[in-house]
Amino acid sequence: MIEYRGDHKVTAVDAQTGTSKFEIQEDVKATVINALPNMRAGLVAVNAGLNNMANGRWCGVNYLTFESTAAKDVHVLGDSIQIAAGMPKSGHMANAQAKVAAAAIVAQLNGWEVNPNPMLTNTCYSMVDAKNCIHVASVHQYVAAEKTFKTVAGSGGVSSIDLKPEVTMLEGAYAESWAQNIWADTLA
């Protein structure tokens, strides 16, 4: 059985006994524990002084270019940024952000107009076993009037809760193909 305890603040994990200790709630013993620390910008971003949002947890950016709002000509993307509403923190999203940032940098270096209407796509696959998978997908459009990205209405997609095994196996094949393509694209 899997239990999510999002309202529990973990203060310690005893790997020897498999026990999670919480700030308020009683200790929980489990066979497998996946304790996740609070997310925040990475140490490189913090040491560079770029973490200027949400009490220093995240880096603010101009979403049109992904230029830092704390340092001119420095671009930040991926897990370190303060995300727009509905924007996931995923490798696919970081890859899409990098493309928008790279295009903006090239435009700025050449004195061209930065693309005023960038779009981002996202797909996240989660393997539920060695062959079966579920997914979530979305498209995000830059909204100039609000200076942020918004999820495009109707663009989201998630695996149905009632998927048959042959469908989740097909999604597993899609996930493998997606992984090969995103790695090739990212490392090209």
Question: What name fits each language-model region?
Answer:
Residues R57-H75, A130-F149:
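FAD-binding beta-loop-beta segment adjacent to the flavin cofactor pocket
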Residues I2-G18:
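A conserved short coil-to-beta-strand element within the FAD-binding core of flavoproteins
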Residues S80-N122, S126, V136:
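A conserved FAD-binding loop/helix module that cradles the flavin
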Residues V10, V32-R40, T123, V128-N132:
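Glycine-rich beta-alpha junction loops
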Residues V136-A188:
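C-terminal auxiliary extensions adjacent to catalytic cores
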Residues V28-N95:
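FAD-site-proximal beta/loop scaffold in flavoenzymes
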Residues V10, F22-E26:
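A structured beta-alpha segment of the ubiquitous adenosine-cofactor-binding alpha/beta core
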